[in-house]
Amino acid sequence: MTIRYPNGKRYNQALQPQKTKMKKHTYGNRGMSLEEELNETNQYYLSHNIACVHKKPTPLQIVKVDYPARSAAVVREAYFKQPSTTDYNGVYKGKYIDFEAKETKNKTNFPLQNFHLHQIEHMKQVIAHDGIAFVIIKFTLYNEIYLLDAKHVISFWNRKDTGGRKSITKQEIEEHGSLLSCGYHPRIDYISILDMVYFS
């Protein structure tokens, strides 16, 4: 399937053979991706009436569809309707929350190239309208997950734009962010950090 951005450029996804993974059924479930862990966490928060947070769908314009069988449709070409903003949004304690989730295999830093300008602008707008914007970053080699307020991400982005570092060091994330605790339910307890940082 061919997917294109609004400007007509082709979206190139790394084409690798799909491997069937057996999920580990351990307490930490280290085989789970950050997105899967957050989706499970958000489902827990919703089912226990703690918060209402959902993953935003990526808006696609489908252009070409093949029907190899009557009951099957295969999308062959699609375009991104518009640049996506952040991954998740919702409401907690009457406040709008909006966040991006990112993973890195780097040991010592998080590359700012993992963000796009429109995501930074979106986070600025959320803050300007008194919403809560942040980023959840997972260092997969350490299995450590941090919550970093968007104002810090914006500051590091501005530093990059003025000729500074093109990444956020792990030390800076540890200093300005909060280490999230991981467990069974909720899997990634970011709400307890929101309580400490934004509601105390």
UniProtKB/Swiss-Prot annotation:
Gene Ontology, cellular component aspect: cytoplasm
Keywords on record: Cytoplasm, DNA damage, DNA recombination, DNA repair, Endonuclease, Hydrolase, Magnesium, Metal-binding, Nuclease
Record site feature (Transition state stabilizer), residues: K102
Organism superkingdom: Bacteria
A Pfam family assignment: RecU
Catalytic activity: Endonucleolytic cleavage at a junction such as a reciprocal single-stranded crossover between two homologous DNA duplexes (Holliday junction)
Its EC number(s): 3.1.21.10
EC category name: hydrolase
Cofactors named for this entry: Mg(2+)
Single biological process term from Gene Ontology: chromosome segregation
Location(s) in or outside the cell: Cytoplasm
Residues engaged in binding Mg(2+): T85, D87, E100, Q119
Name listed for the protein in its UniProt record: Holliday junction resolvase RecU
Gene from which this protein is expressed: recU
